[in-house]
Amino acid sequence: MSASSSASGAQQQRFAAYLDSLAHAAEHLDRAAPLKSYCTGLLLPGERKSIEPLAARLAPHDVRRMHQSLHHFVANAPWSDEALLETARHYVLPMMKRNGPVVAWIVDDTGFPKKGTHSVGVVRQYCGQVGKQENCRVAVSLSLATEQASLPVAWRLYLPEIWVKDRERRKQTGIPEEISFATKPAIALQQIRKVVEEEVATAPVLADAAYGNDSEFREGLSELGLQYVIGVQKSTTVWRAGKAPLPAKRWKGRGRPPRLLRRNKQHQPLSLKQLAKSLPPISWKPVSWREGTKQKLRSRFTALRVRVAHRDYWRSELPTEEWLLIEWPTEESEPTKYWLATLSADTELTALVKLAKHRWIIERDYQELKQELGLGHYEGRGWRGFHHHATLCIAAYGFLIAERSRFSPSARAGQLDLRAPEIPPEYRPRGTPRAR
């Protein structure tokens, strides 16, 4: 037996064992076969990863039966997405950590353009995939990341208020009764709390300004004992080092003693943009953070200690000092990005930059999940099917990550050595015009 065939056989055995563990998490024995088929189909080459093309690749001589089996398993079967993702995490995370510890928990969301108004969660909203307002649905995720890899461990559809209040559409798409309106930062905080409760080793939380602008999100992370490096908008106000709100007014002996911090016209915080532009040129340092496709990625940064001023006039104690990290590329007329970070006061500028910029790794996940595993290909309209399909995509992706982790950090394992029956030449997907 050749070395390559031996390696392929070992990989097949690992994949089979992994699928067995996922099937166990799906509970019912009759769900094992469609689960294994679905995950295998997601990893096979092919442009579309919706149910019918999967069925055609997996059972080209019995497409109808396979289609019914996969559709029931994904759209109707009441297995737990959380249990399956947890099983995938228990398998994949130790493999990822072979090449280094988890360095970040990454919060993000991704959009799926979708026509019509009947698919669960679809409204006109900002869609990152196309970079503008579009008819789409958006899901929030939490990923655990090492230096080389990351794995989504939580996933939930953002449900706009118009959907939450529409009883008829809720019924038609099977939205669970317990699902109420929650902002994207609130969904992310729920996901983070759950992973903290499961006693997963913690790491600083990374997120963009869509989450960092929410003060309740930042405060929620701190209450959980988690550090963060998260984007904020330039209008955010802060007190620079050495400055702070005025103390409470002196008590005059009547009524309750004043306890709230104060401001006045002469004593106001600065916006991040104002603060950045007030800094001397010597403040800005060149920092490179990783290799790009052609050269090292490099820009100018500065970091200073600040206190966030958000509603501090309702506080009786000074807010804690934290880092403000600012990026100002030399070719730009003003700073382009701002982050708040609760890392220790002795953290070096380079470490702050590298961690803030590590959020890029989730973009690679989404790209591969969408392009290679068909994350956005689910064609059903229901809540359960949308989440089940995403969970299976993530689980299949997890096995790819685990296999890559067996190689050196810079290596790529390539595609799995999976085989599927050849599709008969006479097969035509539903909706294909008949030949004349």
Question: What is each PLM-predicted segment?
Answer:
Residues 325-341, 358-373:
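A glycine-rich, aromatic-flanked flexible loop/lid motif
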Residues 111-112, 330-331, 344-346:
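Short, glycine-/Ser/Thr-/acidic-enriched flexible segments
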Residues 138, 361, 365, 388-394:
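Catalytic-loop motifs flanking and including active-site residues across diverse enzymes
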Residues 107, 111, 211, 258-269, ...:
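Short amphipathic alpha-helical "interface-anchor" segments enriched in bulky aromatics
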Residues 101-102, 139, 321-322, 335-338:
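Short, surface-exposed beta-edge/turn micro-motifs
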Residues 2-206, 210-230, 234-237, 244, ...:
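Conserved, well-structured functional cores that handle cations and Mg-NTP chemistry
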Residues 1-31, 42, 159, 173-180, ...:
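A short, flexible helix-boundary coil/loop motif
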